[in-house]
Regions:
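C-terminal hydrophobic helical "lid"/dimerization subdomain
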Residues: 21-22, 330-380
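NAD(P)H dinucleotide-binding glycine-rich loop of Rossmann-like/cofactor-binding domains
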Residues: 117-203
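Mid-domain Rossmann-like dinucleotide-binding core that forms the NAD(H)/NADP(H) cofactor-binding site
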Residues: 168-249
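Glycine-rich cofactor phosphate-binding loops and adjacent beta1-alpha1 units
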Residues: 224-227, 234-321
Length: 380
């Protein structure tokens, strides 16, 4: 099918659609789960293939990556997301159609989603803080009904897709879309890491932790990473200089001992300069004791609990910086992909599933046992 739309200037505006089939399969749920039995609600449905609006592209999904917000969505907590729902924030694929106003993409381009959807015109957006936009929504989590990446074809505004560079696969790009972006924004955009710093990556076995280790090493930092004991060797293989079991009650004492041994070429006080935090819970105060004077903790989540007690003496006495972070900018995603194309950052893929195996895939992510890196789903 070829559709030509004439523009007002001398150049024809057009989009070419190669979607010959009329329907596609999609992973849909129409109710929330109360017991995390995802198999009860996840169903494969036949839906119409989307056609692009004037500013949109449609792409055939080759790979999509799981995120924890998929589980929040299926629970309907902390947000009651639109129903019926298609999840999937991180999707990569091949462009099959473009709207008449699309300028920078064409049919056949390899693209990946940038799931942070914002108004693009408010003061926050135009100052480079689109992640703080009051109208921000997360595509595939808050959008809908029936608008996400777990399907054969999906659509997004041109501004919410990024070209995949040569040498990066669809699977690697999907894995990196939100997770690498989040890690890059935490360390580079917010904490502004510098060569020679000592960086503690909490939960290094997770998706964000994997990228956090690599980004810190890219910037010439010394890295201590934590994980469960079965993942410590993998942290070292990924580039961490030291690996610590954070399930031990005294894990922070091991970190402190390492910090005292490391020559401080950029200061005279031993301690951690930057803590990459997304665990929260009972670890929080232990982390604060490890920071150097003027040190920074950058947090983007709290998988072990939100209600962390804080000993304020650590903060005011040492002049600590506590920074929050969510996602990042489209430009930061492109920066990360540049380094991926140079082989300096890689995506760690734990496992791959089909859409029909979605319940099993999400259960694995929820339990986390033996999980190292990202879980990928493919439509076929």
């Amino acid at each position: 099918m070829i559709i030509i739309v004439c523009g007002s200037d001398d150049t024809d505006k057009s989009y070419i659609s190669t979607n010959m089939k009329k329907t596609m399969k999609a992973l849909v749920y129409e109710e929330y789960t109360t017991d995390d039995d995802f198999s009860k609600i996840l169903k494969i449905k036949d839906l119409p293939i989307p056609e692009p609006k004037s500013n949109e592209i449609v792409f055939k999904v080759k790979a999509a990556a799981l995120n924890y917000d998929d589980i929040w969505g299926m629970r309907g907590k902390p947000l009651a997301i639109p129903l019926p729902h298609i999840s999937g924030t991180d999707a990569a694929g091949e462009v099959t159609a473009v709207g008449e106003d699309v300028k920078n993409f064409k049919v056949g381009d390899r693209v990946v989603s940038h799931g942070n959807m914002s108004c693009r015109v408010c003061k926050r957006c135009t100052s480079g803080r689109e992640y703080d936009c009051k109208k921000r929504t997360i595509w595939g989590f808050e959008t809908g009904p029936l608008w996400g990446g777990y399907c054969e074809y999906t659509h997004l505004p041109e501004v919410n897709v990024v070209k995949i560079p040569e040498g990066v696969s669809y699977e690697e790009a999907a894995a990196a879309s939100m997770t690498m972006l989040t890690s890059w924004h935490m360390l580079v955009g917010r904490a502004k890491i510098q060569p020679g710093q000592l960086v503690l990556i909490m939960g290094g076995g997770s998706g964000v932790g994997n990228y956090g280790i690599q980004i810190a090493k890219l910037f010439g930092c010394t890295v201590i990473a934590t994980a469960s004991p079965d993942k410590l060797d993998q942290l070292l293989e990924l580039g961490a200089d030291y690996a610590i079991d954070h399930r031990k009650d005294d894990w922070h004492k091991e970190v402190r001992a390492i910090a005292k041994k490391i020559p401080k070429a950029y200061g005279d006080t031993p301690g951690v300069d930057v803590i990459f935090e997304h665990i929260g819970g009972s670890h929080w105060n232990k982390e604060l004791t490890l920071l150097n004077y003027g040190g920074t903790v950058i947090t983007t989540g709290a998988t072990t609990g939100y209600m962390a007690k804080t000993d304020l003496r650590h903060i005011f006495f040492k002049g600590l910086n506590i920074l929050g972070s969510t996602q990042g900018t489209r430009a930061e995603l492109e920066q990360g992909f540049y380094w991926m194309s140079k082989g300096k950052i890689k995506s760690i893929i734990d496992s791959e599933y089909t859409l029909e195996q979605a319940a099993e895939a999400h259960t694995k992510m929820l339990k986390g046992k033996g999980l190292f890196g990202k879980i990928i789903m493919k439509p076929s």
